């Protein structure tokens, strides 16, 4: 199932995506003059931070709306899938990705492409959803969808691997894994809370429902999660778990 993006909703409800990326940016340690590919660059806010290091950063995103938003920030970005990158062999010193790889359906094809466009010894540094990511949200959403005969939709959205599984996959693609960590990261949500998170990050699921059912699913899922994911002040804290790694081609 393809996820669709509303860039305005993403900017409003997904600021934490780039705001909490300091850890993986630190692992990348971009250097002036390096050629870096940012896979799934989104609206380009994090890509801008990378360019500020003096690195030569190229963005790529499969969403035409996200690619267009990144271009308004002055980012060089191509619209293409991670499974078919429009770049020459060995073109980049590093490939970077934040909060994007779990959306990629063809993981093995993506890894083969990353390995191809990296120079020998180049690094692949990324953070993505890991095993257990938004588990409570997914269970609640699946339960509500199942009431209406659509319980399989959520299972088609994302890939949240264990460190062991992803290490094995990277090695099969020819990488040498240097670091791999699974990191729990409780994440405060924006003012719209869980309802806006669902409308933004599960838009692909909701778009596959009959129109009259979409808001009912949002409301019922939000109600199920209220006791588990709201704090004493009523703020929503999503149960994020990140998988962060460094691998060498």
Language model regions located:
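Conserved class I S-adenosyl-L-methionine
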Residues: 1-34, 45-49, 66-69, 123-148
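Class I SAM-dependent methyltransferase SAM/SAH-binding core
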Residues: 35-84, 94
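A short SAM/SAH-binding and catalytic strip from SAM-dependent methyltransferases
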Residues: 94-107
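A short glycine-rich, Lys/Arg-flanked "PGG" loop and its adjoining helix->strand segment in the class I
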Residues: 108-123
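Short alpha-helix
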Residues: 159-173
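C-terminal helical/coil "lid" or tail adjacent to the Rossmann-like core of SAM-dependent
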Residues: 173, 178-233
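Core SAM-dependent methyltransferase catalytic element
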Residues: 243-249
């Amino acid at each position: 199932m393809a996820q669709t993006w509303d860039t305005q909703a993403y900017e409003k409800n997904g600021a934490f995506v780039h705001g909490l990326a300091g850890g993986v940016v630190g692992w990348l340690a971009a250097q002036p003059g390096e050629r870096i590919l940012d896979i799934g660059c989104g609206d380009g806010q994090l890509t801008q931070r990378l360019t500020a290091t003096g690195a030569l950063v190229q963005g790529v995103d499969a969403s035409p709306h996200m690619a267009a938003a990144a271009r308004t920030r002055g980012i060089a970005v191509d619209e293409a899938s991670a499974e078919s990158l429009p770049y020459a062999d060995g073109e980049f010193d590093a490939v970077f990705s934040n909060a994007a790889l779990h959306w990629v359906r063809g993981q093995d094809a993506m890894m083969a492409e990353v390995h191809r466009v990296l120079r020998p010894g180049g690094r692949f540094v990324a953070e993505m959803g890991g095993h257990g990511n938004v588990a409570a949200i997914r269970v609640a959403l699946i339960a509500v969808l199942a009431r209406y005969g659509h319980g399989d939709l959520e299972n088609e959205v994302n890939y949240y691997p264990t460190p062991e599984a992803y290490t094995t996959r990277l090695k099969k693609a020819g990488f040498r894994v240097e670091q791999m960590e699974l990191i729990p990261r409780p994440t405060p949500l924006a003012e719209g809370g869980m309802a806006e998170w669902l409308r933004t990050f599960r838009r692909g699921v909701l778009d596959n429902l009959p129109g009259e059912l979409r808001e009912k699913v949002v409301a019922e899922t939000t109600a199920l999660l209220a006791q588990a994911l709201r704090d004493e002040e009523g703020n929503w804290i999503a149960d994020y778990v990140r998988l962060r790694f460094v691998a060498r081609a």
